[in-house]
Design a protein with these regions (language model features):
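Alpha-helix C-terminal capping segments
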Residues: 60-65, 278-282
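Metal-dependent amide/peptide-bond hydrolase catalytic core
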Residues: 152-331
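A non-catalytic alpha/beta surface segment that caps or lines the substrate-entry region
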Residues: 1-11
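Structural motif
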Residues: 12-14, 102, 126-128, 286-290
Length: 331
């Protein structure tokens, strides 16, 4: 197949995987499961083991057919997708700065197996924050007045964050996911640790939610005379795919699956830090999109009984076997 472009291009094929530190616990399961990690009590529970397998399969095929290509192909395995933590440090290495075409992917969503969509829907921009409150311990019966209660500061912040006024008619979200505090029932809590996230359909909406959350956290710490340290733990931007990349992906998809299964999905997919990589590619003149390989699942993503139809791995391989030659093929 002849290449579509007169100059060599660099398509970046992207797979993400999650190691065990972001996996879910299985310790309280009463039903047998089909997939668990070698680390006892953990599983991927989102399909990242499948993404890794897809990537390895594509790498093997590329290696076997190197004489058929005229460009450079980068296959990137991204750690720490959960919590949108892995993309930013990878983009800062410059690995995506010379990429002409970029394709990210994710499997699952309990769609009919064989579904392929380079127009999956909406990814929200998101910021993940960790807040550490520091107060002063004191005996809660003898000298409570000497303490500075970090637990109350954290609790006040959690309530205030969930009371943030939302822009009318706009898509935003927030959640305080964890709040851990204190040392004992008779000790004024000297510390508290909070994990939270905000989201918005645009960068501007996400920034509004982030700034409001930070403001509430700082004000709550001040109310209880505590100190607070706020750290950005992860981020994702909004999803803005390129039509040229979408059209290439549809051509490849329709060579693999039916016309009915190669289609826009219109899903609301939370957040995806692959968008950070895509934006970096676009800032340097490249194009890209994000492809969903739908398949049936035994439970929802991030649930303890999650498993996926492994037929999707072969479908994804055939998709890239069609896509790659369109961009860098020489025969």
């Amino acid at each position: 197949m002849s290449p579509l472009f007169s100059k060599p291009v660099v398509p970046a094929l992207f797979w993400q995987f999650v190691s065990t530190w972001t996996a879910l616990t299985l310790m309280k399961l009463t039903k047998p499961v089909t997939v668990r990690l070698m680390k006892a009590g953990h599983m991927h529970s989102c399909g990242h083991d499948g993404h890794t397998t897809m990537g390895i399969a594509v790498c093997n095929w590329i290696q076997e057919n190197l004489d058929q290509f005229c460009g450079t192909i980068k296959v990137v395995f991204q750690p720490a997708e959960e919590g949108v933590r892995g993309a930013r440090p990878m983009t800062e290495t410059g690995i995506f700065d010379d990429v002409d075409f970029f394709f990210g992917n994710h499997l699952g969503f309990n769609l009919p197996t064989g579904t392929i969509s380079p127009e999956p829907g909406v990814f929200l921009a998101s910021t993940k924050l960790d807040a550490t409150f520091t107060g002063l311990a004191a005996h809660s019966g003898a000298d409570p007045q000497k303490g500075k209660n970090a637990l109350l500061a954290g609790a006040a912040a959690a309530l205030a964050i969930h009371g943030i006024t939302r822009p009318i008619g706009e898509v935003t979200a927030l959640n305080v996911g964890t709040l851990v505090a204190g040392q004992g029932r008779n000790v004024v809590a000297p510390n508290a640790f909070m994990q939270l996230e905000v989201r918005g359909e645009t960068e501007e909406l996400n920034a509004y939610m982030r700034d409001q959350a930070i403001r509430k956290i700082k004000a709550s710490a001040d109310m209880y005379d505590c100190q607070v340290d706020i750290v950005k733990a992860g981020e994702a931007t909004e999803f803005k795919p390129d039509q040229e990349a979408i059209e290439l992906a549809y051509i490849a998809a329709r060579n693999v699956t039916t016309e009915e299964l190669a289609r826009p999905l219109g899903l609301k997919l939370g957040s995806e830090d692959c968008t950070i990589m895509l934006r970096r590619v676009q800032q340097h003149g490249g194009k890209g999109t994000f492809v969903v390989f739908g398949c049936r699942t035994s439970a929802g993503h991030h649930q303890r009984l999650f498993d996926f139809d492994e037929e999707v791995i072969g479908i994804a391989l055939r998709f890239y076997q069609n896509l790659i030659p369109m961009i860098v093929g020489i025969k």
